[in-house]
């Protein structure tokens, strides 16, 4: 099973053109893309790991593979 840090996921999203749309006082961040439909929601601290269904959900929302 692949394990990846939240910070690495965010770096990959930004490199692909996604930008931070919402980040309030919660641990959830929402990213939007200028041409792709939908939003990508990422929860957790930057140092947290993501794997399994959470990573699959982020891949589905963004169209990226990690």
Description of each model-found segment:
Residues 1-23, 27, 31-66:
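Basic nucleic-acid-binding interfaces
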């Amino acid at each position: 099973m692949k394990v990846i840090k939240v910070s690495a996921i965010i770096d990959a999203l930004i490199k692909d053109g996604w930008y931070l749309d919402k980040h309030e006082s919660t641990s959830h961040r929402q990213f939007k893309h200028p041409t792709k439909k939908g939003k990508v929601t990422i929860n957790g601290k930057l140092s947290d790991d993501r794997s399994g269904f959470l990573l699959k959900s982020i891949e589905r929302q963004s169209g990226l593979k990690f």
